[in-house]
Amino acid sequence: MKKPIGILSPGVALGTAGGAMSSKFFLMALATFFSFAQVVIEANSWWSLGMNNPVQMSEVYIIGAQPLCSQLAGLSQGQKKLCHLYQDHMQYIGEGAKTGIKECQYQFRHRRWNCSTVDNTSVFGRVMQIGSRETAFTYAVSAAGVVNAMSRACREGELSTCGCSRAARPKDLPRDWLWGGCGDNIDYGYRFAKEFVDARERERIHAKGSYESARILMNLHNNEAGRRTVYNLADVACKCHGVSGSCSLKTCWLQLADFRKVGDALKEKYDSAAAMRLNSRGKLVQVNSRFNSPTTQDLVYIDPSPDYCVRNESTGSLGTQGRLCNKTSEGMDGCELMCCGRGYDQFKTVQTERCHCKFHWCCYVKCKKCTEIVDQFVCK
């Protein structure tokens, strides 16, 4: 049973990013574009909030601590203003970023690019400077993570400006079922995530038609795709009431989907992402006009992916040397594809796992520890 759609309208077109630019700066921007063919993105990112220790995160969000927001690495000016206004929200921005990062690493664990993080506030390194489909996925899944975290924080009473969901009762809900359990506040989560995550892109000003403006449009589109995926996958959940579980009465509410389901959906969008370019009006259009235009839930990209086989400091590729591979697989995790034809080394390792588990009354499970020697394969 699907929920009613309240705040989203279908078919929002991709907008333009612009702003006036002096001729001198315009020429400099063009020179940068033709020299490097990639956008220079700020080293810091709000994603870095997801890399901090959760205990430390909760300790620094003290009401009235004005220096806090200016000290947080990775926030744009607009995001710092929102931080000052909604300091109790920032812990959940961090949790959302962390959720997105972990899901990215899960979805790409068997790919040459495995969503590795680096030890600085850019989080993913220089690879995000390229407008590739991997970058598209990363923006989408992190935006989705924020919607997820904020929506749940509202339901749990952690935020001062929101509470349980006030979504309208679905029209197809049986009349004798109650509507109004404390649901995840996805409306609020969506709105705040949009305001916060998009702030950096909306305050950047570049010449119409420049590569930088194309990246802004790409980022905004993929942010929205991530948010909509969370919104559209949320559904109605119900709990039975009645004597001996007879379920003669049900109470229902709006509930977020498991985030793995969101990650799976975005991974499918990654595989079918649309290649885009800027047209003469400064809007993103599909490179191949024979295909249907991407919807607001599809991912888009403007650059081909770099070579992830070898380490490259300029593109941020870490290469696949030293990565574990599956000798028997013919998929992306197989040694042939993962190692890019370079071959692999084999070694033996000892693995310990629980085994021979038995249930004892009452009430615990007791297991033994078993060890075995297994073969592992590592890319040369």
From Swiss-Prot:
Keywords: Chondrogenesis, Developmental protein, Differentiation, Disulfide bond, Extracellular matrix, Glycoprotein, Lipoprotein, Secreted, Signal, Wnt signaling pathway. Disruption phenotype: Mice display perinatal lethality and display gross morphological defects in outgrowing tissues. They are truncated caudally, displaying loss of the tail and a significant shortening of the anterior-posterior axis. The shape of the head is abnormal with truncated snout, mandible and tongue and reduced outgrowth of the external ear. Fore- and hindlimbs lack digits, the genital tubercle is missing and chondrocyte differentiation is inhibited. One of its GO terms (molecular function) is receptor tyrosine kinase-like orphan receptor binding. Residues 1-37 form the signal peptide. GO terms for biological process: activation of GTPase activity; animal organ morphogenesis; anterior/posterior axis specification, embryo; anterior/posterior pattern specification; atrial septum development; axis elongation; axon extension involved in axon guidance; axon guidance. Changing residue 312 to Q: Abolishes glycosylation. Its main location: secreted. GO terms for cellular component: cell surface; endoplasmic reticulum lumen; extracellular matrix; extracellular region; extracellular space; glutamatergic synapse; postsynapse; Schaffer collateral - CA1 synapse. It is found in: Secreted, Extracellular space, Extracellular matrix; Secreted. SMART domains: WNT1. InterPro entries: Wnt, Wnt_C, Wnt_CS. A lipid is attached at residue 244 (O-palmitoleoyl serine). Pfam families: wnt. Glycosylation is necessary for secretion but not for activity. Palmitoleoylation is required for efficient binding to frizzled receptors. Depalmitoleoylation leads to Wnt signaling pathway inhibition. Disulfide bonds join 104-115, 154-162, 164-182, 238-252, 240-247, 309-340, 325-335, 339-379, 355-370, 357-367, 362-363. Expressed in a gradient at the caudal end of the embryo during gastrulation and later in the distal-most aspect of several structures that extend from the body such as the limbs and genital tubercle. Ligand for members of the frizzled family of seven transmembrane receptors. Can activate or inhibit canonical Wnt signaling, depending on receptor context. In the presence of FZD4, activates beta-catenin signaling. In the presence of ROR2, inhibits the canonical Wnt pathway by promoting beta-catenin degradation through a GSK3-independent pathway which involves down-regulation of beta-catenin-induced reporter gene expression. Suppression of the canonical pathway allows chondrogenesis to occur and inhibits tumor formation. Stimulates cell migration. Belongs to the Wnt family. This is Protein Wnt-5a. It comes from Mus musculus.
